[in-house]
Regions:
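Active-site-proximal cap/lid insertion segments
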Residues: 28-31, 38-54, 77, 162-269
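Loop/turn elements at helix/coil->beta-strand transitions in domains of secreted/extracellular proteins
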Residues: 29-34, 65-70, 133-140, 218-225
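N-terminal secretory signal peptides that target proteins for export/translocation
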Residues: 1-8
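Catalytic-site neighborhoods of secreted/periplasmic enzymes
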Residues: 84-198
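Sec/Tat signal peptide C-region and signal peptidase I cleavage site
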Residues: 23-27
Length: 269
């Protein structure tokens, strides 16, 4: 996993460096775009931002060589989750107050009027990958989609399309149980989740990205790659070598803003 991720981030740095030199190139030159998206990752999990409890050497390299938006905030959601809102805002170009409406238009329904179909098609044609495609880019996607439109239609190439989160065995959530041993293990593949298929989904996404960069070299068009990792969104699973890096004595849990999760009753907690 680490080798593939290092390759991926190394190539991202190279792509970023290419973009920095565009000012001296011809105006018609289009840069390659490699967009990497982690799922629900908080700023407290990046060492470069002053949180050294976690090792993030590749993210640190990108932060040091690029631009950090340290006052950019997720404004929330129309539901108990912020992941779906983040994705719809990015893909549709809508802010939070209009992203839900865009989601509803894209979702459509079984019986739509001609006007509703036209609105859905117009919304779809303005999705980020569609715009990039019309601008002359080869477009590629892998990972978590969670958008109310078909990824394999929005992008020219889409692989290993994942939903909001994987199904998981009850052991991952119903724990710990009083006076009973904890059966859960974040690196045991029998619990499915991110291990479904035998390889951690982060590894799958990284492999897809590295492979496509190699394929894209055969095309004269610049590429737009949307690489969407499901992690660190729950279920909290990772290969053992990464779990072993973080004994409990090293982990500091961030303070909560509320005493209780406001949507706990809705999800059966």
């Amino acid at each position: 996993m680490s080798k593939k991720l290092i390759q991926l981030f190394g190539r991202l740095v190279a792509v970023a460096a290419l973009g920095l030199g565009l000012g001296q190139a011809e105006a018609k030159t289009k840069p390659n775009v490699l967009f990497i998206f982690a799922d629900d990752q908080c700023y407290e999990t990046v060492a470069n931002l002053g949180h050294t409890d976690i090792d993030t050497p590749n993210l640190d390299r990108l932060a040091e060589r690029g631009t950090q938006f340290t006052r950019a905030y997720n404004m929330g959601s129309w539901s108990g989750a912020v992941c779906v809102a983040s994705r719809h805002m990015l893909i549709t170009g809508r802010h939070i107050w209009r992203a839900q409406k865009a989601q509803q238009v894209l979702r459509g329904g079984k019986k739509l009027t001609d006007a509703q179909k036209a609105a859905r098609d117009a919304e779809f044609n303005n999705l980020w990958p569609q715009v990039m495609g019309r601008a002359g880019y080869q477009t590629f996607f892998t990972g978590k989609w969670h958008i109310s439109a078909a990824a394999d239609k929005a992008f020219q190439v889409a692989r290993n399309i994942r939903g909001g989160m994987p199904n998981q065995t009850p052991e991952g959530y119903n724990r710990p149980l009083p006076d009973k041993p904890d059966p859960w293990s974040p690196y045991d593949i029998k619990f499915d989740g991110f291990w479904k298929g035998g390889k951690h989904w982060s590894e799958v996404v990284a492999d897809d990205a590295v492979d496509y960069i190699g394929e894209a070299k055969q095309d004269k068009r610049p590429f737009f790659m949307y690489i969407a990792f499901n992690a660190p969104h729950d279920p909290r699973q990772a290969p053992k070598e990464y779990i072993d890096r973080y004994p409990l004595s090293r982990i500091k849990v961030p303070a909560s803003y509320l005493d209780e999760y406001p949507y706990k009753d809705d999800i059966g907690c």
